[in-house]
Amino acid sequence: MDAQNTTSSAKPTVGSLFAGIGGFDLGFEQAGFQTAWQVEIDPVCRAVLSDRFPHAAQYADVRTCLSELKSVDVVVGGFPCQDVSIAGRRRGLAGERTGLFFDAMRIVDNLKPRWLVLENVPGLLNSNDGKDFQTVVQSLAECGYVGYWRVLDARYFGVPTKRRRVFLVAGLGEQPPFGFMADTGPVGRLAGKAETDSPWADAHPTLLAGFTIGSNIDISGANICLIPGGRGAMVERGRAVADDGLLKGLDAANFAAARAAGNAVCPPVARWIAEKLITTF
């Protein structure tokens, strides 16, 4: 353990870049880490972070916060994916948002955490004919980090959705635990599938009022699933997360809530990684 970051009686500390609503941070805290600080530019997400992680310091911009950040044992970050996603224009690391990776590495190079964990969409692997991923790996190496990468799917960690993300786990001059990213996720906890054999029908015009169908929705928003024997009544929409705390930042803005959750790192996946790393302290 790095003495400048933690003591023998303290929990290993984590600093979170591009923290979102704290998916990475939650998973690491569930494994026994303590979040020291979080950097997130979206004020809505920062409100959630402030509510859910009151013990952590919050900062807004990875480009300007370096002088305020304290040393930590682990830095985690799901850096922006918009410029490498197949749904975007794919400017890669030259893009304004995904290019913030270099600002993140400037922080890492200065703080020198023992471990670094990064996350992005699988599109990072083939962006710019694979050159962008080579640049990412080279940047880590130039800062003294060596490790592994692997694409992990959240559905194998008890989450009812297919969510493939590439994770890079690297140590400062040391490899992560042997076989770390060669292991499989807990495949015995494969999440149950949603019903796919129920009939579909056109939604009532009232349900479509003010609704815009996104370009990437697989099933038309004008269709709804009919549940055989179900009651023809409106029901309260369920959330994937609790409203308490979210409402303080989201103010009942459903779109903001969905976007924040959609951008978040899946906590069970983060926890699986964290449980491997905490054995090294």
Where are these regions (language model features)?
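Class I S-adenosyl-L-methionine
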Residues: 7, 64-74, 82-257
